[in-house]
A protein has these predicted regions:
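P-loop NTP-binding core
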Residues: 1-183
Length: 183
């Protein structure tokens, strides 16, 4: 990938840089994890223009990237995908403390296995998030079906499998709260 978000911010937006996923759903990939000071300065203006053009903007960021702080600053709210293990639990709590619970829309546990340890951290998340207003849906189970759908460019809504009902409901909870807040 030679051109994406970085190119659009630095050299001008161009519809050809976007990948159309579905009707009214576009993806602007990040072609590099290296962002210059110039990118950071121009990013706010770029996002403000996108806010006018789009109803919703989702930034899928790698939490270890330095630019992640910039993405967090310009976001209205964050959806944090996480796992049920000690280090990820602690890291998630650190993000909540750093940005404030009011900046966090949802915390979604992914690749959940019904093990003693994961159940323990799920309960810890529940306890920690109680009364914060953060949306905390049922965890997304680790399923090979989901992995296969992703590999084939499909979503969990494009399968009739009953195994996906919990995952669909979890995402529906998050989406409905986003729409509800916007209305």
């Amino acid at each position: 990938l030679s051109k994406g978000l970085r190119h659009a911010v630095l050299y001008g937006d161009n519809r050809d840089l976007y990948i159309k996923i579905r009707e009214n759903l576009y993806f602007l990939p990040t072609e590099s994890s290296i962002f210059s000071e110039s990118f950071e300065k121009k990013f706010d203006n770029f996002i403000e223009k996108k806010r006018i053009e789009y109803d919703y903007i989702f930034i899928d960021s790698i939490p270890t990237m330095d630019i992640d702080k910039k993405f967090m600053e310009c976001s209205d709210q964050l959806i944090i995908p996480t796992f049920c293990d000690y280090s990820t639990y602690e890291g998630t709590l650190n993000v909540i403390e750093e940005v404030g619970a009011n900046k966090i829309h949802s915390i979604v546990i992914n690749l959940f296995k019904n093990t003693k340890i994961q159940k323990k951290y799920y309960a810890e998340f529940e306890k920690s998030l109680l009364g914060t207003g953060i949306v905390f849906p049922k965890p997304i189970k680790e399923l090979s079906l989901i992995e296969n759908l992703i590999e084939n460019g499909k979503t969990i809504w494009e399968s009739g499998s009953k195994l996906l009902i919990d995952a669909q409901n979890s995402f529906a909870d998050v989406i409905s709260k986003i729409i509800e807040k916007r209305s």
